[in-house]
């Protein structure tokens, strides 16, 4: 058994805010992104080019893309819409943790019930990792992406590594 921990670098992270009651804006943004904006709390959708659109709140989403031009494309296409597009790529990083016992390991640092809150392939949750705000995104395989501010990356990474030392494999 193993736990694999690695940083996922160089992905674009774009914050999108808009009025969810503005059907024209929601429809246009969904068309631009190639997938519907998730309206159900703690879910995400994925488009044909594997960009994730993650629900952060009723009027806020995080788009994750490996396209370096994703921000400018979205900004230009939403220019005439009542939408706010912000590049937050330099603010956040992603730690991917993979393995059979990741829920057991992460439960040492979270009060969130992962079995309940990350039960489907398109689920996500915002919570505290010890005292650090994080976004947890379940992947389609046995992995969870932990989105956190860059300044907390080493702290979280070191806690996870320390936490593996007394797992009973």
Feature roles, as predicted:
Residues 1-169:
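Basic, glycine/lysine-rich polyanion-binding surfaces/domains
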């Amino acid at each position: 058994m193993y736990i694999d921990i690695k940083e996922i670098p160089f992905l674009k992270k774009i914050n999108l805010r808009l009025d969810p009651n503005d059907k024209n804006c929601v429809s246009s943004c969904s068309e631009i992104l190639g997938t519907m904006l998730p309206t159900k709390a703690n879910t995400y959708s994925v488009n044909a080019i594997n960009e994730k659109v993650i629900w952060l709140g009723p009027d806020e989403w995080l788009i994750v893309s490996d396209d370096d031009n994703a921000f400018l494309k979205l900004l230009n296409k939403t220019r005439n819409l009542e939408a706010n597009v912000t590049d937050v790529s330099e603010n956040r990083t992603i730690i991917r943790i993979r393995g059979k016992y990741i829920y057991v390991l992460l439960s040492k640092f979270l009060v969130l019930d992962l079995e309940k809150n990350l039960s489907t392939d398109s689920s996500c949750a915002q919570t505290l990792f010890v005292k650090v705000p994080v976004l947890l995104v379940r992947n389609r395989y046995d992995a969870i992406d932990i989105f956190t501010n860059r300044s907390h990356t080493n702290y979280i990474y070191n806690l996870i590594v320390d936490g593996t030392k007394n797992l009973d494999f």
